[in-house]
Amino acid sequence: MAGLRARGGPGPGLLALSALGFCLMLQVSAKRPPKTPPCPPSCSCTRDTAFCVDSKAVPRNLPSEVISLTLVNAAFSEIQDGAFSHLPLLQFLLLNSNKFTLIGDNAFTGLSHLQYLFIENNDIWALSKFTFRGLKSLTHLSLANNNLQTLPRDIFRPLDILNDLDLRGNSLNCDCKVKWLVEWLAHTNTTVAPIYCASPPRFQEHKVQDLPLREFDCITTDFVLYQTLSFPAVSAEPFLYSSDLYLALAQPGVSACTILKWDYVERQLRDYDRIPAPSAVHCKPMVVDSQLYVVVAQLFGGSYIYHWDPNTTRFTRLQDIDPQRVRKPNDLEAFRIDGDWYFAVADSSKAGATSLYRWHQNGFYSHQALHPWHRDTDLEFVDGEGKPRLIVSSSSQAPVIYQWSRTQKQFVAQGEVTQVPDAQAVKHFRAGRDSYLCLSRYIGDSKILRWEGTRFSEVQALPSRGSLALQPFLVGGRRYLALGSDFSFTQIYQWDEGRQKFVRFQELAVQAPRAFCYMPAGDAQLLLAPSFKGQTLVYRHVVVDLSA
């Protein structure tokens, strides 16, 4: 029987010994202390919390189950991308009294369970636009008592379920950069404690929530370099022909009148054609009865009129301009009076006279000689109040105003602009019901004059030593004045309607400009600046929203 029991299984003694050994193992195991979770020296940790003081970086060696982290008096200045991504279960994060100055994009990426984020009493002066990206569970956010002066537009957009926001204790500058916040506060369902402006003075101590949006003037403009034409030029004239936009440039350096065509696809000016012109000072396009003509005024070698032949797609010389009448042209103006086309040439030679030509059937013919012996420099045609006028500026006397006589069909001298005896160029503009003249001077200040009914009166002087070119122009309701100089960069002024004066707006790096030309090209508003010494520059007028 004993042998049978041995083969069938353990006896009672062996079973008892096994039971005793198991009990001893349990006793030994019960006496071992629990395993200590990992924790950096600067932190105090439990299984799911960590409290860190004087850390030199975001602690890395933390329990993986941590759901609550507090950082106090941290010694690093920036929280970078993914700084807490190693703590994916984090639900509570307190960053208090640290030396942070900047929190970057995606700083809290990977914290999809974070519900409470308190960033308080730090030195933070800037947050990135995507600082809070990825915090889809965040319900409470505090940015109280930092040095924030502004907030990036739509910084709170990723926080879909945010319930409470605290921005108190910051130095918010309530300028255009904060306009979006005023709009957001008016429409959000998030509870936001009252916050106040620290600046500018007119808004100081005003509650941000109560600021009227109409007080924010945040739309401005800018002229940005759009295209560089790698050649000098002394005049620029845009024109439309057969529904296409072109530009005629006088380029004595390459002995040509260059015709450029606007490419509406590439949105650039492209080479199109050239007219031989060894000493061109002005290339004036005119479209008469659907035919294109270009008047080429030259200092030497005679001046000519070219006609565009659409059949041969080339320019052919149509007629010569009498060299005894036009000796040394300096400017050319084209205009229409009572249905007839004219162009006038300012002659700057000592023995020359500004001449008027009229289109008749198949050519331009001499119509009138104006202002002889005065070395004329510029012309400006003014058609206001039904009285066409031509203003002629001269280097030897005050600008002369001629008025068109419909009886004589000629210009008749009307008077002089005595305030500026040595104007190099003359331009005009209207603002409201008032008419103004702009006169540039090479030595002395350029002048802005207003017509008072019987005479001109000076309203403004603009510093302009070395100026040979100026041009007022209107873009989308905004009036500007481009004023060039041979000794400094070009100044752009903007018209202040309240003060009825031009105020300095922008400086453009144009060397020795000889003209300025405004050219709308589709939705692009362009300002061309032909340069005598350098490249011809094309600037684009852009509208800038400072609140964006």
UniProtKB/Swiss-Prot annotation:
Positions of EAR repeats: 222-264, 268-310, 314-361, 363-406, 410-453, 455-497, 501-543
LRR repeat spans: 89-110, 113-134, 137-158
Record's signal peptide: 1-30
Keyword Repeat: yes
Subcellular location: Secreted; Cytoplasmic vesicle, Secretory vesicle, Synaptic vesicle; Synapse, Synaptosome
LRRNT domain residues: 31-64
Name the record gives this protein: Leucine-rich repeat LGI family member 3
Function of the protein: May participate in the regulation of neuronal exocytosis.
Keyword Cytoplasm found: no
GO BP: any one term: exocytosis
Gene that encodes it: LGI3
Disulfide bonding pattern of the chain: none
Any matching Pfam family: EPTP
GO cellular component, one term: synaptic vesicle
Principal localisation: secreted
